[in-house]
Curated annotation (Swiss-Prot):
Part of the 50S ribosomal subunit. One of its GO terms (biological process) is cytoplasmic translation. Keywords: Ribonucleoprotein, Ribosomal protein, RNA-binding, rRNA-binding. This is Large ribosomal subunit protein uL22. Belongs to the universal ribosomal protein uL22 family. The lineage of its organism: Archaea, Methanobacteriati, Methanobacteriota, Methanomada group, Methanococci. GO terms for cellular component: cytosolic large ribosomal subunit. It comes from Methanococcus maripaludis (strain C5 / ATCC BAA-1333). This protein binds specifically to 23S rRNA. It makes multiple contacts with different domains of the 23S rRNA in the assembled 50S subunit and ribosome. GO terms for molecular function: rRNA binding; structural constituent of ribosome.
Length: 153
């Protein structure tokens, strides 16, 4: 596998980073979640993702919002979804970054998400057998998530 570099250079003294590789989640859901989580404090981001998993707070979909239903409440836009699977995977990557910050000796209560992004991973190619000896492709896309946490004062 190729070495994946971080998109943003950060000072290693006051930052902690983590990466989730080849996650089997929707690319569109990951893009919308990363846009929403960027710049949040870590505790607020974890609470937000837990509310999304519990179907209490929808994630506003601003780019991939064709044929989406309206959601009640203040979400910043009319349409939104509850991407539970993507939220769970991103929550695990954030937990890993928090543990990396603890290992470095950073104050975990004063961490904010400096950078979070999703990149396209490789495609797992599979085939579904059909009638009369044919086969249809059944491909699974994967993505990579990058997280950089920064200690603020």
């Amino acid at each position: 596998m190729a070495k994946l570099k971080y998109k943003v250079e950060a000072d290693p003294k006051n930052t902690a980073r983590a990466m989730g590789r080849t996650l089997r989640i929707s690319r569109k859901h990951a893009i919308e979640l990363c846009r929403e989580l960027s710049g949040m404090k870590l505790d607020a981001a974890v609470a937000y993702l837990n509310r999304v998993i519990a179907l209490e707070t929808p994630v506003p979909f601003k780019v991939h919002n064709k044929d989406l239903p309206h959601r009640k409440g203040k979400i910043g836009t009319h349409s939104g979804r509850f991407p539970q699977k993507a939220s769970l995977e991103i929550l695990q990557v954030l937990d890993n970054a928090k543990k990396n910050a603890e290992q470095k000796g950073l104050n975990t209560e004063k961490l904010r998400i400096k950078h979070i992004s999703s990149n396209r991973g490789f495609t797992i190619k599979r085939y579904m057998p059909r009638a009369f000896g044919r086969a249809s492709p059944k491909n699974q896309e994967t993505i990579h998530i990058q997280v950089i946490l920064e200690e603020f004062y």
